[in-house]
């Protein structure tokens, strides 16, 4: 796994463990992290799937500002891979 994906997974795991983030956002972050770690699928497929999932949750009105900023950071890193 590349360093960028490791960095992204680390941020997603932080969101997953953050209690101030709503459960649906934490679950989506956890699923995204697991998808990125799944070596059986092609990297471009994994990244595009995660981009779609995270883009959807970044528009959730209940997401705290700090978590939204982290998700935007993840999206930016994934788009640059």
Where are these regions (language model features)?
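Peripheral, non-catalytic segments of secretory and membrane proteins
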Residues: 1-81
């Amino acid at each position: 796994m590349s360093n960028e994906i490791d960095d992204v997974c680390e941020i997603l795991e932080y969101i997953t463990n953050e209690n101030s983030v709503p459960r649906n956002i934490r679950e989506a972050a956890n699923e995204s992290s697991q998808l990125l770690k799944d070596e059986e699928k092609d990297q471009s497929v994994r990244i595009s799937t995660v981009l779609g999932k995270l883009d959807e949750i970044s528009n959730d009105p209940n997401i705290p500002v700090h978590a939204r900023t982290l998700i935007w950071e993840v999206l930016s890193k994934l788009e640059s891979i």
